[in-house]
Amino acid sequence: SIRKGIESLASGKDFENLFESAKSRAIADWLVGMNLSRLYSCLYNQNYSVGRVQTPTLSMIAERDSEITGFIKEPYYVVEIVTDDFSLSTERIDSKEIADQLSNLVPEELIVTEVINKEKITKPEPLFDLTALQRAANRYFGFSAKQTLDYLQSLYEKKLVTYPRTDSRYLTEDMKQTVCEMLDTVGEGFERDAKNIDSIFKNEKVSDHHAILPTLAAMKNGPGTLPSSEKKIYDLIQAKLLMCTSSNLIESTTKVIVEFDGVTFSASGKTVLEEGFFGFVKPFLNNKKNETILPKLSEGDVLSIKGSIVRQKFTQPPKHFTEETLLKAMELAGAEDIEKGIEVERKGLGTPATRAGVIENLIYKGFIERDKKNLLATHKGMSLITIVSEEFRSPKKTAEWEMKLSKIADGKESSKDFLKDIERDISNLVNHYQK
């Protein structure tokens, strides 16, 4: 395959536009970081660091923290009616007076208005790229993104897993035989039961490197003795392969609806019919998948009501970012601002290989801090976001740049024009403060 690759090498000229695009990105990042860091540090007599990726990332954390700080809880009410076997509840009611009136009017018997039975089929998610693995490791084990990357790099150097810094969650078609051999190491006949095996092979979805897998040798011989943290990551990667190729999770869902005095009461139930891939997820969960079993009911059945309760609840603020949710937000940042039909090389803030470093850098520079699993903006971080221009703290700028860089790679836009625009934006900002 190496000889074949050498024989079919493309001309270097074919990649000149791609080179210009990559060079322009590096220069633009340098221009923004060098000029804006010095600008804001001099203006406010603080050691501030500004970057195209790190500042919008900090902005997302700071804005979320501000939303939580400014959130005012509002009470609302639900009326719950109790039968012998289960309870039904209303939707949100804003007035306690109305909720109390409704509760007092509930009769001793109510008729079932509707029963909705459905079969819910859930397919397994794709294989791991680096970001998806970092998110899963943070969710299941509390590992930071950097810790996961370090453990993964160690496993890679021990030849137990494939290349770690990938942004693809699929494999190429020519890997199918190898994957089948991997599955056969789990147990005889497993490969024949791998009903979703074809879903993980998509040539068009593989960029420079395919999804993260255990190596065939590791699957055949076992990973050997590993530090506990590395063992957790290896087991998670192996379980992901088995999960992605296994059958779907099939659940039976039931919704019972009762209408009274123009108000809808409902109860929902769910039971697992076929566990499928979920069997490989369970070992990593603290709690088993909850099942709520409702009695068999039909439209027109009479329910004997034992009582009714008015429950007060409160609206909830958004949750602080964890590394899991921040990585997802970085991956999706600015995606809605990319024009349809344009394929960009990089979407979101950073790359799978750099996002962990961005988070650690923000912590090291004192802009954010860890509070258990949460990531919080510090006073210094909040101060920086308050003073930085909206243009340079918004992920929209990243989307705009990536669209232009994509056009440069396609030969449809000039790198000189792109960099002139960057220089103009920076000059305008500096001139604004000089007035």
What are these regions (language model features)?
Residues 1-334, 339-367, 372-374, 379-386:
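Toprim catalytic domain recognition across nucleic-acid enzymes
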Residues 191-212, 393-434:
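Leucine-rich, amphipathic alpha-helical/linker segments
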